[in-house]
């Protein structure tokens, strides 16, 4: 399979340049505690309809112990939730 183009290349954003921290995200998103899936927003490009955010993952996440014990992997449903929260913030 040929390589795919990036939606946004990692060189286009800086994870250290926080546009919105957790406190700003909370002004727009209602999720709290275990359901907060964003730590910060680091890039917005309204002309391209793009927004980049991230979540700091720790050993204390509720899913780490069981998904999967030897090699924790963020569950797909949590990835979808993170994308939904990013979309909710951006719109």
Kindly give the residue locations of the regions a language model identified:
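Active-site helix/loop of acyl-thioester processing domains in fatty-acid/polyketide metabolism
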Residues: 41, 73-91
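Non-catalytic linker/capping segments at the edges of enzyme domains
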Residues: 1-73
């Amino acid at each position: 399979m040929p390589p795919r183009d990036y939606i946004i290349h990692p060189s286009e954003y800086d994870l250290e340049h926080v546009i919105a921290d957790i406190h700003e995200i909370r002004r727009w998103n209602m999720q709290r505690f275990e359901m907060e899936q964003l730590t910060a927003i680091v890039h917005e490009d309204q002309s391209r309809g793009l927004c980049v955010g991230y979540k700091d993952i720790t050993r204390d996440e509720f899913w780490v112990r069981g998904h999967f014990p030897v090699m924790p992997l963020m569950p797909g449903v949590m990835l979808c939730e993170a994308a939904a929260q990013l979309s909710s913030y951006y719109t």
